[in-house]
Amino acid sequence: MNKQVNLILILLISVFSFAQNTDGYTLLFQEEEPLKIKLKYSNKEMNKKTNDSTFIETQLSYEDAGVWKDVDVRLRARGNFRRNTCYWPPVKVKIKKSAAAGTVFEGNKSLKLVLPCMMEPDKNDNIMKEYMAYKLYEQISPYHFNARRVDIDFTEVRGRKEKSHQIKGFLIEDDDIVAKRFEGKVVDRFIHPLAMD
């Protein structure tokens, strides 16, 4: 526990000690405060009915200055291992340009939503460790993905019943935005895990 507290303190000190240049960041990633969002969908449907080209449609609600606003989004489960292993798989969020216009999501057509793997209470701690790794990397490298913490009020649809969950997660910006910011390009390339050092 002491190690976690020390790591959090070091991260907070480094975040507030170094001024970050937010030029090129979308509005969503210019703030450090956790974004409160609400999502409602069937986890079972997400796992079984979505793939690289098939999405489910829903609304993402977010709090902006005390007022809840809605954005139409399309969602799909990501990843093979987590999709088969986790209760909540990571989610790819697609937002139409017209739906994102004038919202905190403007400029973000595609985001990754990282969620805890399991429903156990301490799993929120694990997701926060992963988030801290992203934030630490922002401090030590000029080439990084921006991440924004989210507090999620998730309503899981289970047939005719609904179950509410309070979970923590974070959003990661799309690789196309990162490539544009650093004047690079995204290269889709499969590298077998055994070929890596």
Predicted regions and their residues:
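Bacterial Sec-dependent N-terminal signal peptides
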Residues: M1-N21
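Phosphate/dinucleotide-binding and metal-coordinating scaffold of catalytic cores
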Residues: Q20-D197
